[in-house]
Amino acid sequence: VGPLFLREAGAGRSLLEPVLRTARARTAVGALPFVLNLIARDQATTDRWAIAEATYQEAIGLARESGQRTELTFGLAGLAWLQARRGREQECRGCAAEALRLSAELGMGLHEIWATAALGELELGLGAAAGAAGHFERLQRLLADHGITDVDLSPGADLVDAYLRLGRHDAAQRVAAQFVAAAVAKGQPWSLARAFRCQGLLADSERGFAEAFEQAVVQHALTPDSFEAARTRLAYGGRLRRARNRVLAREQLRAAAEVFERLDARPWADRAHAELAATGETRRLRDPSSLGGLTPQELQIAVLLTGGKTTREAAAALFLSPKTVEYHLRHVYQKLGIHSRDELALLLAAQGVPAGDRPGT
């Protein structure tokens, strides 16, 4: 399962989903939180954020009920990180605080690292660069203390972003040089893309930043992390706008805004729209049929039912009564303005939750 944390998850994904199906079929409550947390981590590092939240919530709930404090810490740290990217400040801080407390009690260094990363990403998304830099600097120290050197876990790219917003160009250059060297040494696309983004942010000419960002876009295309790809396009579009190349800037910024809207990454979507407005483009209305209005349990029920399970089977998988499942399904229909499971399946697919990727199907 290590690749799930190092952005090399393809093989692990195919192994975990059959395990989850077996655990559900056997009502193996003790095994479910661990498997659910791993699947949620994979979902959160791709573009399946809505179902990732539901999966984390289920893992957290089962871990609390069964007294599995290690898995509870895992789920809380993971959910904090996801909520950070969505700009859900209260939820993120609450999950991170509990995860940090449990990490200290249990000696879970990895989860402390993850919760700290969540707080840094929250501050960065909210525009609090100084707070973000403080958390990322602490994260660097934690990684060093635990002997963790893999560049995929490094906050280097985010720290460069924070330092530049603070006007600390020398510090940004120093961190970027270290991060780029580590990314090149590993040679994997996810970190290479972020390394090229750092170079694009720091380049002192239009040709220089364009070449760096274009290389970043190429590397992003080799990974499933659409959020990081959108961040690169946002940075690229911002530099193009400041270079007075409004036409090309709008192309990058529209692409970034579309991804942030689809993921419900509100602070980042707002920033992309602000950049677009600075080019003279009017903001488009948000699609009311997004999944953001569903509760995690409603979404979990939706994906199970559209994945082929009957109401009774979905109820058994989630330890609910069939009547409760039907009650939640009615609310799903009302919130989304639809009337059938076929419409629901189409909407889920349009929002990036294809049936083959859904846990438990």
Where do the language-model regions lie?
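Amphipathic alpha-helical segments of tetratricopeptide repeats
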Residues: 17-28, 57-68, 97-108, 137-148, ...
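N-terminal regulatory/sensing modules of transcriptional regulators
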Residues: 9-10, 57, 97, 124-126, ...
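Helix-turn-helix DNA-binding segment
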Residues: 277, 283-361
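TPR-repeat structural position
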Residues: 9, 29, 49, 69, ...
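Tandem amphipathic alpha-helical repeat scaffolds
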Residues: 1-11, 31-48, 71-87, 111-126, ...
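Generic long, charged, amphipathic alpha-helical segments
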Residues: 176-235, 279-291
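Hydrophobic/aromatic side-chain positions at a characteristic register within alpha-helices
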Residues: 4, 24, 44, 64, ...
